[in-house]
């Protein structure tokens, strides 16, 4: 009788230990899976650091703009650093060149062009950082990204807009000496080689 009781007690103890330890065993696995799924994405600190070194002394309000982008769109899996120039009174053109940076597929030079239509004032020579979301492959960046951008440099000289192609989002963050206020309805065409044709 005693050995039967002892056997049941041992079984209950083993069950208790198994139930107690199983969540502890599962937690690291779940955390590792989550870390693995985010391994191709950039943290906010990584983007802020890249932006500060790129924009230099003008980067005072950059962290606030990046924080707003992360709150709206989450973690990007790529970012572009480059320069563009455009100027318009009612209609104009935008040209730029830069580099796509990814964690899993390296760095890729690229160019962008596009019309800028709407109520634009002034000229613009701008450094630009673009956050890239849901990019399935580097080839998917070579496309037309359209959107409505209301640019007002309200955070220490930085403006943020949104462009989209299918599920891929591009969020340009710009700074520059020009002031372009109003509604800019246009698109950016991203190409692997330079071209003067924005269409």
Question: Which residues does each predicted region cover?
Answer:
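N-terminal secretory signal peptides that target proteins for export/translocation
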Residues: 1-10
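Residues at the start of alpha-helices and the adjacent loop-to-helix junctions
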Residues: 10, 23-25, 43, 74
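Bacterial N-terminal signal peptides
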Residues: 13-27
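Sec/Tat signal peptide C-region and signal peptidase I cleavage site
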Residues: 26-34
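Small-residue-enriched, tightly packed secondary-structure blocks
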Residues: 34-199
């Amino acid at each position: 009788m005693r050995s039967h009781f002892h056997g049941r007690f041992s079984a209950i103890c083993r069950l208790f230990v198994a139930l107690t330890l199983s969540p502890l065993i599962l937690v690291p696995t779940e955390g590792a899976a989550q870390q693995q799924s985010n391994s191709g994405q950039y943290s906010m600190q990584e983007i802020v650091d890249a932006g500060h070194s790129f924009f230099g002394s003008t980067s005072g309000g950059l962290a606030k703009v990046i924080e707003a982008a992360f709150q709206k769109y989450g973690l990007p899996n790529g970012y572009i650093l480059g320069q563009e120039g455009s100027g318009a009174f009612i209609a104009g053109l935008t040209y730029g060149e830069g580099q796509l940076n990814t964690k899993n597929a390296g760095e890729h030079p690229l160019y962008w062009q596009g019309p800028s239509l709407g109520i634009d004032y002034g000229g613009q020579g701008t450094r630009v950082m673009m956050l890239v979301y849901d990019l399935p492959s580097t080839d998917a960046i070579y496309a037309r990204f359209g959107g409505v951008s209301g640019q007002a440099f309200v955070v220490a000289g930085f403006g943020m807009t949104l462009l989209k192609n299918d599920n891929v989002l591009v969020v340009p963050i710009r700074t520059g000496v020009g002031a372009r206020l109003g509604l800019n309805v246009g698109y950016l065409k991203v190409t692997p080689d330079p071209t003067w044709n924005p269409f």
